[in-house]
């Protein structure tokens, strides 16, 4: 193996270890542990630029360490990678311990699927939101490739609908939810209970995680959430810059060895 490739691998492993330090288990007891989805859902550690971001490998390791303890799951996320989110949903569904889900402010897009990872109804406060919409993706290429992408998105939507269908409120048809997805619908806790099996909790003061990408790609985000997210977005941008500087410095140190 060429020396430069060895250095790259060493650098990548070291950077991975550094990023991992931003992830920690919170409020673990002998019988339970808290799991937070307070950032974007991303594909892997390289995409987890914010300490709040979650990805399948991190969740797999978290669940292995939790080792069957009860999970208290707290969600304040606008979503992210649909395939990463589905993987996380399936891992949580398989987890043998008791799961209790709380939507602290926002379970949007694929995070709304994760909110239903428990067989019991998640708790959504009356001032928190469940946001559902059709999956989207960027694509470039010829007409054949575009049609393939459209078919893929339809298949992904069918998978998401199958999750929602397991948690419909009595008398609600899945076609109604499909229509809500087409319109990109934001449901507060009270409204969400009209369509899904959810528990409506008391109002809380957690600000919803309306990140820049949510503002850009979601047409109907409530105005109060968009305004509340500005300060958080600035804080996350600063964290992003600090983490990038840390990884770049680590990379340069290993490349100079």
Residue locations for each model-derived region?
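N-terminal organellar transit peptides
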Residues: 1-102, 106-110, 118-257
């Amino acid at each position: 193996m060429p020396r430069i490739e060895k250095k790259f691998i060493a650098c990548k492993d070291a950077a991975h270890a550094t990023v991992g330090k931003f992830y920690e288990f919170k409020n673990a007891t002998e019988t339970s542990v808290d799991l937070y989805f307070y950032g974007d859902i991303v594909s892997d550690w390289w995409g987890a630029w914010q300490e709040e971001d979650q990805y399948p490998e991190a969740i797999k390791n978290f669940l292995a360490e939790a080792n069957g303890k009860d999970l208290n799951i707290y969600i304040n996320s606008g979503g992210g990678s649909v395939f990463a989110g589905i993987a996380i949903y399936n891992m949580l569904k398989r987890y043998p311990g008791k799961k209790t889900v709380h939507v602290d402010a926002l379970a949007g897009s694929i995070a709304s699927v994760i909110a239903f990872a428990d067989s019991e109804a998640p708790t959504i406060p009356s001032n928190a939101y469940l946001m559902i919409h059709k999956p989207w993706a960027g694509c470039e290429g010829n007409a054949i490739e575009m049609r393939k992408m459209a078919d893929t998105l339809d298949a992904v939507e069918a998978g998401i609908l199958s999750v929602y269908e397991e948690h419909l409120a009595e008398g609600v048809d899945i076609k109604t939810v499909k229509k809500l997805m087409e319109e990109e619908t934001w449901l507060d806790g009270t409204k969400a209970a009209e369509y899904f099996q959810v528990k409506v909790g008391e109002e809380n003061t957690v600000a919803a995680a309306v990140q820049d990408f949510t503002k850009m790609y979601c047409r109907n985000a409530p105005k109060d959430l968009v305004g509340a997210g500005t300060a958080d977005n600035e804080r996350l941008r600063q964290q992003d810059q600090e983490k990038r500087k840390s990884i770049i410095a680590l990379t340069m140190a290993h490349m100079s060895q």
